[in-house]
């Protein structure tokens, strides 16, 4: 290898190492800060806002209103757990059984990819990472998930998730969603309304709360049944999530 190539390789290696250190400090600081402080915006919100501006849409505003867990209807937390991650109170960020099922399904159905991300993984991804599929992003997501599971309580993870989840075009967080679609605060959401909001996750740009398709209504009904089977509101109290 020539001297010039060695110099370039050495420069790139030093740059990547420094970048990794900067990102580790940034993400570590974010995990520590947001264990107690409200989250003002997420990486997904920034990505959506920048994309809108680049496409000339200057009216788009990625909007979120932070609310604490006691300002959110317990039905909402139960609905997303029933819909997205029923083992949320038990696992340490990853649902191994669901991952194995998803891998088996994806091998048989290459055109219909199924995910197995837990609420913890989705929180890490939405808060700190870019959208898309890649092994690099999944690796970073795994590390960040372990970080928030180590530092945050389950209640804190659920609180952040509900405040940064995307529920429609420019609608982030359950408070903004409740106001937009039901004209009420998140604390007043009914069981059925909570299930409808959860039914569009994790693809709220395809499935609409404001114009629910037959699939969304079917999923809403399924979520309501799962909420009942989990035990209703006592489930949230039992696991100290309310």
From Swiss-Prot:
GO cellular component labels: peptidoglycan-based cell wall; plasma membrane
Biological source species: Shigella dysenteriae serotype 1 (strain Sd197)
Main localization category: membrane
Subcellular location: Cell inner membrane
Chain's role: Peptidoglycan polymerase that catalyzes glycan chain elongation from lipid-linked precursors.
Record-listed E.C. numbers: 2.4.99.28
Name listed for the protein in its UniProt record: Biosynthetic peptidoglycan transglycosylase
Domain of life: Bacteria
Any one of the GO BP annotations: cell wall organization
Family: Belongs to the glycosyltransferase 51 family.
Protein topology in the membrane: Single-pass membrane protein
PANTHER family on file: BIOSYNTHETIC PEPTIDOGLYCAN TRANSGLYCOSYLASE, MONOFUNCTIONAL BIOSYNTHETIC PEPTIDOGLYCAN TRANSGLYCOSYLASE
